[in-house]
């Protein structure tokens, strides 16, 4: 599959091994995993960071290689069930942060044409994702602008 704003192909990688159940060495209780997920979310970690922490640090010293295999739910589903989900989806928030950083850089460095183009591409991605999330995770009247992005990020 191709990338969005280039003529190159996407990067390929190895597939994860298919598994129907968690490995034998990772026998952590589902409730303990859910508690740890909510605890990490309350500390301010994003869902992807939570997955990495569970993989590396684990619960009670035992690593959890795949939360969905261990609990039957994704990290975001666990957060929704415990009312600890972030206000905005993680991918959308990351794009907003990137756009704010790029906008400030372009204002300070007006001749940086490469990053002007990068800002345009990022804003395009934000508008596409906003269309996808509008009405569900975003307000129906949401319209992207630098000011609204900065306000959202500062919250």
Swiss-Prot record:
Keywords: Ribonucleoprotein, Ribosomal protein. Residues 21-33 have a biased composition (Acidic residues). Residues 1-10 have a biased composition (Basic residues). Residues 1-66 are annotated as: Disordered. GO terms for biological process: translation. The keyword Ribosomal protein applies. Residues 34-45 have a biased composition (Basic and acidic residues). Pfam families: Ribosomal_S13_N, Ribosomal_S15. The keyword Ribosomal protein applies. InterPro entries: Ribosomal_uS15 (IPR000589), Ribosomal_uS15_arc_euk (IPR023029), Ribosomal_uS15_N (IPR012606), uS15_NS1_RNA-bd_sf (IPR009068). GO terms for cellular component: cytosolic small ribosomal subunit. GO terms for molecular function: small ribosomal subunit rRNA binding; structural constituent of ribosome. PROSITE patterns: RIBOSOMAL_S15. It comes from the Archaea. Belongs to the universal ribosomal protein uS15 family. Part of the 30S ribosomal subunit. This is Small ribosomal subunit protein uS15. The gene is rps15.
């Amino acid at each position: 599959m191709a990338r969005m704003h280039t003529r190159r192909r996407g990067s390929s990688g190895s597939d994860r091994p298919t598994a129907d159940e968690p490995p034998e060495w990772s026998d952590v209780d589902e409730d303990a995993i859910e508690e740890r997920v909510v605890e990490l979310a309350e500390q301010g970690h994003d869902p992807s960071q939570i997955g990495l922490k569970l993989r590396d640090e684990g619960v009670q010293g035992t690593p959890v290689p795949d939360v969905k295999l261990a609990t039957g739910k994704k990290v975001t589903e666990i957060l929704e069930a415990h009312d600890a989900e972030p206000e905005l989806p993680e991918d959308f928030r990351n794009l907003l942060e990137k756009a704010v950083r790029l906008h400030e850089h372009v204002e300070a460095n007006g001749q940086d044409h490469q990053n002007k183009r990068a800002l345009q591409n990022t804003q395009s991605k934000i508008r596409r994702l906003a269309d996808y999330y509008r009405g569900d995770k975003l307000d129906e009247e949401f319209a992207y602008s630098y000011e609204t992005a900065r306000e959202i990020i500062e919250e």
